[in-house]
Design a protein with these regions (language model features):
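Membrane-proximal soluble regions of multi-pass membrane proteins
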Residues: 53-110, 167, 171, 175-180
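Hydrophobic secondary-structure block in the mid-to-C-terminal portion of proteins
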Residues: 138-180
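Hydrophobic alpha-helical transmembrane segments of multi-pass integral membrane proteins
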Residues: 12-18, 38, 42, 88, ...
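Hydrophobic core segments of alpha-helical transmembrane domains in multi-pass membrane proteins
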Residues: 32-41, 131, 143-152
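Transmembrane helix interruption/hinge and helix-loop junction motifs
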Residues: 25-30, 135-143
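Hydrophobic alpha-helical membrane-embedded segments
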Residues: 26-78, 155-159
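Cytosolic-side membrane-entry/anchor segment at the start of a transmembrane helix
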Residues: 1-37, 109, 160-173, 180
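Transmembrane alpha-helical segments and their cytosolic interface motifs
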Residues: 109-139
C-alpha cells in the first residue's frame, strides 16, 4: 500500500504540473475543474504521507492505550455492530502491514500502533477540510467539497477500524501479562 500511495502522489504531481500551466494559458473552465480536482487530491495524498511520517517520528508506535482518548466508549461496541465492521474490516487496506503483523511485533506494540494509526487518521480528517478555506480564492467549490468530504469519510473508516480492533487486542495483551 505504501508504494501505491507514493506512486499515486507522484502521478498526481505530474498531472498537476501539466494541467496548471495549460489552465493558466487557456483559461478553459474544464481544465480549471480538472486542475483544481487534481491539485486538491494531490494535497490529500501529500498531507497523508506527511502526517503519517510526522506522527511516526514523534510517537514511534508507543502511544498509551490507557489514555482516556483511546479507551473504548460505552456506545462503541453497539455502533460497530450496527455498522457491521466485522464483515468488512478484512477488505480495508493497511498502509504498513508489518506494523500489525503478530509474527514480527508483540501485541503491546500492535496496540500502540493502533493508537498511533488512530491519531494519524483523526488529524488527517481535520486537515481534509482545510482545502475548503481555499474556495474563495480558487473556486471549484463542488470539486473541493467533494474531495474533502470523501477524504474525511475514508479516514473515518480507518479510525473506526483501529477503535474496533483495539479492545480485543488489549484483552489479549492483558491475558499474556497475567501469564507472565
Amino acid at each position: 500500500m505504501k508504494k501505491k500511495m507514493i506512486l499515486t502522489t507522484v502521478f498526481l504531481f505530474i498531472g498537476f504540473a501539466i494541467s496548471l500551466p495549460i489552465f493558466i494559458v487557456t483559461g478553459n473552465a474544464i481544465i480549471e475543474i480538472i486542475t483544481i480536482t487534481i491539485g486538491v487530491t494531490l494535497y490529500h495524498f501529500l498531507m497523508r504521507l506527511a502526517v503519517g511520517t510526522i506522527v511516526n517520528l514523534i510517537m514511534k508506535n508507543k502511544a498509551n492505550h490507557k489514555s482516556i482518548w483511546f479507551r473504548e466508549k460505552n456506545f462503541e461496541r453497539k455502533f460497530y455492530n450496527l455498522l457491521r465492521v466485522r464483515k468488512w474490516k478484512k477488505y480495508i487496506p493497511t498502509y504498513s502491514p508489518d506494523t500489525f503483523d503478530t509474527s514480527q511485533k508483540t501485541v503491546k506494540e500492535i496496540v500502540g500502533a493502533t493508537c498511533q494509526a488512530e491519531i494519524v487518521h483523526e488529524v488527517i480528517m481535520v486537515l481534509s477540510l482545510l482545502p475548503i478555506a481555499a474556495i474563495p480564492f480558487l473556486g471549484g467549490a463542488a470539486a473541493i467539497f467533494t474531495t474533502s468530504f470523501l477524504s474525511m469519510l475514508i479516514d473515518a473508516v480507518f479510525v473506526i477500524l483501529q477503535r474496533y480492533n483495539r479492545p480485543m487486542l488489549v484483552r489479549v495483551m492483558e491475558r499474556f501479562d497475567k501469564l507472565k
